[in-house]
From Swiss-Prot:
GO terms for molecular function: betaine reductase activity; glycine reductase activity; sarcosine reductase activity. Transmembrane segments: none annotated. Belongs to the GrdA family. It comes from Acetoanaerobium sticklandii (strain ATCC 12662 / DSM 519 / JCM 1433 / CCUG 9281 / NCIMB 10654 / HF) (Clostridium sticklandii). Coiled coil: none annotated. This is Glycine/sarcosine/betaine reductase complex component A. It comes from the Bacteria. In the first step of glycine, betaine and sarcosine reductases, the substrate is bound to component PB via a Schiff base intermediate. Then the PB-activated substrate is nucleophilically attacked by the selenol anion of component PA to transform it to a carboxymethylated selenoether and the respective amine. By action of component PC, acetyl phosphate is formed, leaving component PA in its oxidized state. Finally component PA becomes reduced by the thioredoxin system to start a new catalytic cycle of reductive deamination. It is an enzyme of class 1 (oxidoreductase).
Length: 158
């Protein structure tokens, strides 16, 4: 059973990293529900902050389904952007600009190149959808950043 089985999934892909549809494809064989998927330009957003509309959607999804049932998957091209997005859905919007300012959701959040995602999905689909970008991204830096954010702010230890 996958860590995503039975979960509601929010995908925030990145135009310059892993796009939303690629992450979605990886999840198709798993019994989970993608409730929202987008592909953003993390570099384009103000200071790399998470899009305000996405913050609103994540807040509403958490209220509707419960934090324990929600997982956020990120495809950011850079560790810093991934960290900002992860911090936003765990500790609240660090820019204090959006609906998640001061709101500690503590959600499970993973990057598409982390083993927590990669090891849970079909290897062939992952290779086809994410493999090329995995070769050019600084995976170690992304993993380190994501683990740091989760260890500080995630309310779930699985």
């Amino acid at each position: 059973m996958s860590r995503f089985t039975g979960k509601k999934i929010v995908i925030i892909g990145d135009r310059d990293g892993i796009p939303g549809p690629a992450i979605e494809e990886c999840l198709k064989p798993i019994d989970c529900e993608v409730i929202f998927s987008s592909t953003e330009c993390f570099v384009u957003t103000a200071a790399g902050a998470m899009d305000l509309e996405n913050q609103k959607r994540i807040k509403e999804a958490t209220e509707k389904f419960g934090a324990e049932n929600l997982v956020v998957l990120i495809g950011a091209a850079e560790a810093e952007a991934a960290g900002l997005a992860a911090e936003t859905v765990t500790a609240g919007d660090p820019t204090f600009a959006g609906p998640l300012a001061g709101v500690e959701l503590g959600l499970r959040v993973y990057h598409a190149v982390e083993p927590e995602f990669k090891d849970e999905v079909d290897a062939q689909i992952f290779d086809d959808q994410v493999g090329m970008m995995e070769m050019v991204l600084n995976v170690d830096e992304i993993i380190e950043e994501m683990q740091s954010i989760r260890s500080q702010f995630c309310k779930f230890n699985d």
